[in-house]
Amino acid sequence: MKFISQMVHNFAKKYAADTMQKSLYNSLRIDITQENIAKIPNPDKKYMLYMHVPFCHTFCPYCSFHKYAYERGACKAYFSALRTEMQRTKDAGYDFETLYVGGGTTLIDEEELARTLELAKSLFSIKEVSCESDPNHIEPESLLRFRGLIDRLSVGVQSFDDDILRKASRYDKFGSGEILREKVSRAVGILPILSLDLIFNFPFQTREILLRDIEAAKAVNPEQITLYPLMKSPLMRDQIARSLGVSNVDNEEEFYSIICKEFSSWHRSNAWAFAREKSNINDEYVGTN
């Protein structure tokens, strides 16, 4: 009976995943047209601006986000194009109260990012800015220049476990779990909110490893901790299997239950994010606008 129940459970999860993938394909499909169509902003609607910085020095084996190898000239040209696009968006009548900057490595060129954020704040009615970062771009002297520009910085630590860091090609790039703890500890308190991001359900991750990661994350005292399940997209599935291995057991549901229990006294911002204090900063940065 338990075997049949597990089969039904697995089938339901696969059906849900397939249905979601088809829905996304239909929603995001872009048809080529020769018509000059301008989308007019709805004055009764609040819009969020998303800015993507697609450059990285090296790539993580599980990451399926749009990215390119960093080249200084291309990066500066890209930021210049971003600023031009923002001006055109302003001229089209759009306004934004929130801005989310994702990547890639968003702070890969601090001067260009600061200049772009300053322009965004001058063009639009932006009240809050959230930005992602990796552990190599959170030195206090770097973050100080972003006071007044970034309200929440999400730092992708992913794990403090050295074995996971090695298999995920992050140990040599960002340092050991101990070094990561030191880096994040120095960064806490510089900007209004620092969110420490972890990944759970690695193929070889155990319950004990997850609990140690949670304990280490809480110990550095960030304002928010976010825990995402490992996203095994079809695009990256083979790469994940080669670098991280393959598990015949899916612990995502069990691990998520552990996470909810461990953060039961924290404020839940969304399904994955937990804050020490309740915040008004928007955590839902992907929508159908």
What are these model-derived regions, one by one?
Residues 51-67:
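Local cysteine-cluster metal-coordination motifs and their immediate loop/turn environment
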Residues 49-51, 155:
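Short beta-strand motif preference
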Residues 41-43, 54, 93:
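Short, flexible hinge/linker loops that cap or flank conserved catalytic cores
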Residues 48, 61, 102:
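Divalent metal-dependent hydrolysis catalytic cores, especially in the metallo-beta-lactamase
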Residues 244-289:
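A C-terminal junction/extension of Radical SAM enzymes
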Residues 1-49, 58:
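Flexible, acidic/Gly-rich N-terminal and inter-domain linker regions that tether
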Residues 91-96, 265-268:
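Surface-exposed helix-capping loop/turn segments at secondary-structure junctions
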Residues 67-90, 97-259:
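Conserved non-cysteine loop/helix-boundary elements of the Radical SAM core domain that shape
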